[in-house]
Amino acid sequence: MENLDVHVLRHLAQWRAQGERALLAAVVRTWGSSPRPIGSIMALGASGAVVGSVSGGCIEDDLIARYSHASDADALRDGAPRLLRYGVSADEAHRFGLPCGGTLELLLEFNPDAAALQQLVQWLDEGRMVRRTVDKATGQVAQQVSDAPEPLVHAGQQVANSFGPEYRMLLIGAGQLSEYLATMALFNGFAVTVCDPREEYSRHWSCLLYTS
């Protein structure tokens, strides 16, 4: 299992390289409680395929419906990046399953450039930290390798987010508790290495295991 952001970007890059319409959604602002933190991303293909998440599920369903039915009045049509806000009213928050008082704002990028996505994924595979900046008016994207992670910045016409290598966790011993801990760590963005000379302990793990 790989880092969730890399997983999302890799699938998005593959879809775009194949000529498929797709969008990239990112959580850029939240008010009150939010199911996913700022910077969380999701890729949505024209076929309805989804990788990643921006909420507990209801917002994803709404995005799929609006992106897949372009004839509807509230459809999400290709074009310049778009800001979309959910949970403005109590009724809307309840309908989309947002926590009490929760509101979130998404940046939607339609059909990101395939070559730029492939370059981004390549840098991430090499273990580099990358700062990606989107111009909301034009959709132009600037990507550059950076030395350290920075929080998402939404200022003026630009949104900048950092993507980079996972934190690393080393576990000594491949017992049952280590398996549970490793699984939780993977879901929280860690690259996990488990060291244990007992090969029989590695046979039934549900995630990638290194033994030594």
Task: Label each PLM-derived region with a short phrase.
Residues 1-208:
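Segments forming oxygen-rich coordination pockets for charged ligands
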Residues 212:
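Short acidic-hydrophobic, aromatic-tinged amphipathic segments that line or gate anion-handling sites
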